[in-house]
């Protein structure tokens, strides 16, 4: 096998592995969320399908595949069908630039555990997260439903507001690492994780990604008591499933990015690098589940106030302070 064919085979294997692992994790994250929320609420949760309910994700998949694929009268056909894919695909594509382990050597060849080690990896992530906004917008607008439209308008405002603070919170990590390449950012944390240098940036990023995931206490676009189910009210079957699984893939991806930027990525003592990366990422996922089970929903004005008047100015101030420290200290 020549070098080009081998490179294609290696990249294909990494892509297939990421698809399998991320989709499986997303399915079982739903199961874990239902069990954890049940424990918080003093009930049992799903425990009927398979031993300890472990086959519940498979049962949910079969249910979604066999449900009617309904399209409302007056809906824009092609945009209605396109929106779920635009919500789910950017999330999983972001995993292409995340280094989920140290490079491994196989048959004398060093293979990075990363699909694409781009020198603008951070910009790639920000670009894809911006594209996901269109899935929310199109899903609400194309449904020909006032509930879906109101949900998409709220979602657009929320995602744009917190996209800004999220991006600004990552600027200090780039200043410390001197690179936009995610593998370089991980390597720069070999001695001390960036959370030690940038606790304020980490806090801003954590709040911002919670808002990006549209989870409680930031689930304004899907407020059940007001908007039924928000921008995906009119979706059913596997198209609804794409919105649903996209949300949980986004949780995993954003947890992986938080790990990469602030918790040293795959670095850690004793355990293998991939295990460290997985443990840190899943810790963020369970933090989001815990928030859903314990916190109330914010009002819309509180949401906007937090994003524009607290997090964004604080992120800008943090950039100025970081620049001053790097220049003069």
Curated annotation (Swiss-Prot):
GO CC annotation terms, alphabetical: plasma membrane; respiratory chain complex I
Transmembrane parts of this sequence: 12-32, 78-98, 120-140, 159-179, 191-211, 242-262, 270-290, 309-329
One GO BP: aerobic respiration
Keywords: Cell inner membrane, Cell membrane, Membrane, NAD, Quinone, Translocase, Transmembrane, Transmembrane helix, Ubiquinone
A Gene Ontology molecular function term of the record: oxidoreductase activity, acting on NAD(P)H, quinone or similar compound as acceptor
Record localization: Cell inner membrane
Catalytically driven reaction(s): a quinone + NADH + 5 H(+)(in) = a quinol + NAD(+) + 4 H(+)(out)
EC number: 7.1.1.-
InterPro entries per record: NADH_UbQ_OxRdtase_su1/FPO, NADH_UbQ_OxRdtase_su1_CS
Function: NDH-1 shuttles electrons from NADH, via FMN and iron-sulfur (Fe-S) centers, to quinones in the respiratory chain. The immediate electron acceptor for the enzyme in this species is believed to be ubiquinone. Couples the redox reaction to proton translocation (for every two electrons transferred, four hydrogen ions are translocated across the cytoplasmic membrane), and thus conserves the redox energy in a proton gradient. This subunit may bind ubiquinone.
Record's protein name: NADH-quinone oxidoreductase subunit H 2
Organism: Geobacter sulfurreducens (strain ATCC 51573 / DSM 12127 / PCA)
Underlying gene: nuoH2
């Amino acid at each position: 096998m020549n070098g080009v064919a081998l490179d294609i085979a290696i990249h294909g294997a990494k892509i297939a592995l990421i698809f399998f692992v991320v989709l499986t994790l997303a399915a079982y994250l739903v199961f874990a969320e239902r069990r954890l929320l049940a424990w918080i609420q003093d009930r049992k949760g799903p425990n009927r399908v398979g031993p300890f309910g472990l086959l519940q994700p498979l049962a949910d998949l079969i249910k979604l595949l066999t449900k009617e694929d309904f399209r409302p009268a007056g809906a824009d056909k092609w945009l209605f069908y396109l929106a779920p894919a635009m919500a789910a695909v950017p999330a999983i594509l972001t995993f292409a630039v995340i280094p989920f382990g140290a490079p491994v050597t196989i048959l004398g060849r060093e293979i990075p555990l990363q699909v694409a080690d781009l020198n603008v990896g951070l910009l790639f992530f920000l670009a894809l997260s911006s594209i996901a906004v269109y899935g929310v917008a199109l899903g609400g607008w194309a449904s020909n439903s006032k509930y879906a439209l109101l949900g998409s308008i709220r979602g657009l405002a929320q995602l744009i507001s917190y996209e800004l603070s999220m991006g600004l919170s990552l600027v200090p990590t780039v200043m410390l690492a001197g690179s936009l390449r995610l593998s370089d950012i991980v390597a720069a944390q070999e001695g001390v994780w960036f959370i030690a240098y940038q606790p304020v940036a980490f806090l801003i990023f954590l709040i911002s990604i919670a808002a990006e995931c549209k989870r409680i206490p930031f689930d304004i676009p899907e407020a059940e008591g007001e908007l039924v189910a928000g921008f995906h009210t009119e979706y059913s079957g596997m198209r609804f499933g794409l919105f649903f699984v996209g949300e949980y893939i986004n949780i995993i991806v954003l947890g992986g990015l938080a790990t990469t930027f602030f918790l040293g990525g795959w670095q850690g003592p004793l355990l293998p690098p991939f295990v460290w990366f997985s443990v840190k990422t899943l810790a963020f996922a369970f933090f989001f589940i815990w928030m859903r089970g314990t916190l109330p929903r914010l009002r819309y004005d509180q949401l906007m106030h937090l994003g524009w008047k607290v997090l964004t100015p604080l992120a800008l101030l943090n950039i100025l302070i970081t620049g001053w420290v790097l220049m003069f200290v």
